[in-house]
């Protein structure tokens, strides 16, 4: 009798065969080993049987990790082992988390940990879709109140046709990289970047991916049934309906009034005062029954329902706007004198100070992946300090949220950057959020576009971003443009769109409820387009195209082409020559195999000096031309004269003077500087020189 009780399910998902397996590996957790094409991911789910005492939030943790052995590689670094999560691993952890979190019921506070480990990869495709499907399958057999399963799909657009789960080779030709996740009946999450595609193309990709993932959802359901998955016996905690009614009667109107205060800090102060009043009114001095916790919950629920009811009934939003109006904008560029490019973008109570720095190719980021090390010439770093929301907090490295927001902003900008062969600088953008009340990632997109143009980066088009929200109750719904932080928290959807006037460059969607129809998504996209165009128009009033020249403080870039056979002369023995040029001119030099030489100088003079030295080394000898030379060696039949770096010619004794001389040393000595003319260069590259009829200094 086997010690393993293995359950397997195989199905075809686009161009890939998918195998789900449980019962063989990591049997003390709810584990699924999923193989999709050439990728294998081990997903383990552990759920606590009960919630911790006093727990008032859902502690879900998702950790995605790539083992280097999966691709037959040994990690770098001193310890030669995997370290902290990379940025890519953090982003995929968030990608898995976002569609599963809203499928756990309100009030479920048991801790759940999901660990997805890539254990094998043929390096032809991303492992994120496999990890998401494996997580869905593991949760389906875990016995938790998970309202899944979910499916997930990557959608590309190649030659106008949607492609399901494209590999790396196909993605290189795609105008779209979109990941969509959802249940049988609803889309829950979208993450994408695009090359200025239309709203219809983006919506079509979302619907295509959702239709295709139904195969995976059906297979996971069958897999869970075969594995004997048991339904959860968790029961939602009951709430004190009598207390709910009393709170509503006493505070609904006051809360509604507080939500008309436009200034965030003043509004929060008013709501905190109302909460304290509710506690004083309804919580006894000796609270043995936990009434305080119930008041906290019901008060928050009343706030939630009040704001939503106001919006759906057509009342003004929290800050007095209607559903389509964008907050007041202020656009400034060139705000930092020494930065290569800078912008201060303010939208209501959200503000981003964004800078662009240009560097040479040696400043590029080296990224370690399972497929090997790659170079990234574009970076966008997003920082969200505690002071931006008027709070204190510990300053540390970037958190998951900051990494995710930075990547979204990067997606929004990347499609409009110039090609590397046209603009070979390394670009680093930093977005420091100085104020926040919703949509700071989209403010970062706007600020990035402005600072890039201020730095002189020739963008294909300016880009802007806007965050949309949704409130839906039954058949009634309202789509909100440019949402506040409160509207994000109290709404049913966070829908962020970035793009130019020509089309969408990034789309991110997180939906908290089912029932988001094609109609709602279409309304949201069209409303976002109108908002984006309004923001772009305001930005264009300040700066609409790149400055004609890059910042005077940025490194100067020059490019020349040399004979590929001369590359070794420029580099020199052991790199000595190029190192000497770099040290003398303080310029950075990059040479390609085809003879293209890129020179980055701290100043224009430094770049020109480096180019002059390179041209001196690589110049071709011209017959008939007179050169300043130096005698480097004297022999019986003449002298060898250096006329260019690395280039010597023979000055025969008969060509030293118009008169006959007996000994070379009667006229020349080693180290002597002379003017010589090139008589001839034979087919072996040997150079014949003469001093006859050449006036010497």
Curated annotation (Swiss-Prot):
Belongs to the polyribonucleotide nucleotidyltransferase family. This is Polyribonucleotide nucleotidyltransferase. Involved in mRNA degradation. Catalyzes the phosphorolysis of single-stranded polyribonucleotides processively in the 3'- to 5'-direction. It is found in: Cytoplasm. PANTHER family: POLYRIBONUCLEOTIDE NUCLEOTIDYLTRANSFERASE, POLYRIBONUCLEOTIDE NUCLEOTIDYLTRANSFERASE 1, MITOCHONDRIAL. GO terms for biological process: mRNA catabolic process; RNA processing. GO terms for cellular component: cytosol. Its cofactor is Mg(2+). Its main location: cytoplasm. Pfam families: KH_1 (PF00013), PNPase (PF03726), RNase_PH (PF01138), RNase_PH_C (PF03725), S1 (PF00575). CDD domains: KH-I_PNPase, RNase_PH_PNPase_1, RNase_PH_PNPase_2, S1_PNPase. The lineage of its organism: Bacteria, Pseudomonadati, Pseudomonadota, Gammaproteobacteria, Moraxellales. PROSITE patterns: KH_TYPE_1, S1. Residues 624-692 form the S1 motif domain. It catalyses: RNA(n+1) + phosphate = RNA(n) + a ribonucleoside 5'-diphosphate. InterPro entries: ExoRNase_PH_dom1, ExoRNase_PH_dom2, ExoRNase_PH_dom2_sf, KH_dom, KH_dom_type_1, KH_dom_type_1_sf, NA-bd_OB-fold, PNPase. Mg(2+) binds at residues 488, 494.
């Amino acid at each position: 009798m086997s010690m393993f009780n293995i359950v397997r399910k195989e199905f075809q998902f686009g161009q890939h065969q998918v195998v789900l397996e449980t019962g063989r590996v990591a049997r003390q957790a709810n584990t699924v080993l999923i193989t999709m094409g050439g990728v294998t991911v081990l997903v383990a789910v552990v759920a606590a049987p009960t919630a911790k005492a006093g727990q008032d939030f859902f502690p879900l943790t998702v950790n995605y990790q790539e083992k280097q052995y999966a691709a037959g590689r040994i990690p770098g670094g001193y310890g030669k082992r995997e370290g902290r999560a990379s940025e890519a691993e953090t982003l995929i952890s968030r990608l898995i988390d976002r569609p599963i979190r809203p499928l756990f019921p309100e009030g479920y506070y048991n801790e759940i940990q999901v660990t997805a480990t890539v254990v094998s990869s043929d390096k032809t495709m991303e492992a994120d879709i496999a990890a998401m499907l494996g997580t869905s399958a593991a949760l389906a057999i875990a016995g938790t109140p998970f309202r899944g399963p979910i499916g997930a799909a990557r959608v590309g657009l190649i030659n106008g046709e949607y492609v399901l789960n494209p590999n790396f080779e196909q993605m290189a030709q795609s105008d779209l990289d979109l990941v969509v996740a959802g249940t049988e009946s609803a889309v829950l999450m979208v993450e994408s970047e695009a090359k200025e595609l239309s709203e219809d193309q983006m919506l079509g990709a979302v619907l295509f991916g959702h239709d295709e993932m139904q195969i995976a959802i059906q297979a996971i359901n069958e897999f869970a049934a075969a594995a004997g998955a048991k339904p959860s016996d968790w029961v939602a905690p009951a709430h004190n309906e009598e207390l709910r009614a009393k709170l509503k009667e006493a505070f609904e109107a006051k809360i509604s009034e507080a939500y008309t205060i436009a200034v965030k800090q003043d509004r929060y102060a008013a709501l905190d005062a109302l909460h304290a009043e509710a506690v004083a009114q309804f919580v006894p001095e000796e609270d043995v029954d936990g009434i305080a916790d119930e008041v906290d919950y019901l008060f928050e629920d009343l706030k939630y329902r009040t704001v939503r009811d106001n919006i759906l009934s057509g009342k003004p939003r929290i800050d007095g706007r209607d559903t389509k109006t964008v907050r007041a904008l202020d656009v400034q560029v060139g705000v930092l004198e020494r930065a290569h490019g800078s912008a201060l973008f303010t939208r209501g109570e959200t503000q981003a100070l964004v800078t662009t720095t240009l560097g040479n190719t040696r400043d590029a980021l080296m990224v370690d992946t399972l497929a090997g090390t790659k170079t990234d010439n574009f970076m966008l770093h997003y920082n969200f300090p505690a002071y931006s929301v008027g709070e204190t907090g510990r300053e540390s490295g970037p958190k998951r949220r900051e990494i995710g927001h930075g990547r979204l902003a990067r997606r929004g900008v990347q499609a409009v950057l110039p090609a590397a062969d046209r603009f070979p600088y390394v670009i680093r953008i930093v977005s420091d959020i100085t104020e926040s009340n919703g949509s700071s990632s989209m403010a970062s997109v706007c600020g990035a576009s402005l600072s890039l143009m201020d730095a002189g980066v020739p963008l294909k088009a300016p880009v802007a971003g806007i965050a949309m929200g949704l409130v839906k109750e039954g058949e009634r719904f309202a789509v909100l443009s440019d949402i506040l932080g409160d509207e994000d928290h109290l709404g049913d959807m966070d829908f962020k769109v970035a793009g130019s006037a020509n089309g969408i460059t990034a789309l991110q969607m997180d939906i908290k409820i089912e029932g988001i129809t094609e109609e709602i998504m279409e309304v949201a996209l069209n409303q976002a387009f109108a908002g984006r165009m309004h923001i772009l128009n305001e930005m264009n009033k300040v700066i609409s195209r790149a400055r004609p020249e890059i910042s005077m403080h940025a490194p100067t870039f020059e490019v020349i082409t040399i004979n590929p056979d001369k590359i070794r002369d420029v580099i020199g023995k052991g790199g000595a020559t190029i190192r000497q040029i770099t040290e003398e001119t303080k310029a950075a030099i990059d040479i390609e195999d085809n003879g293209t030489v890129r020179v980055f100088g701290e100043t224009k003079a430094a770049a020109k000096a480096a180019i002059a030295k390179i041209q001196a080394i690589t110049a071709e000898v011209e017959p008939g031309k007179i050169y300043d030379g130096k005698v480097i060696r004297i022999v019986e039949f003449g002298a060898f004269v250096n006329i260019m770096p690395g280039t010597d010619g023979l000055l025969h004794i008969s060509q030293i003077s118009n008169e006959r001389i007996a000994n070379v040393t009667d006229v020349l000595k080693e180290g002597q500087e002379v003017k010589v003319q090139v008589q001839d260069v034979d087919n072996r590259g040997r150079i014949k020189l003469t001093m006859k009829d050449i006036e010497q200094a």
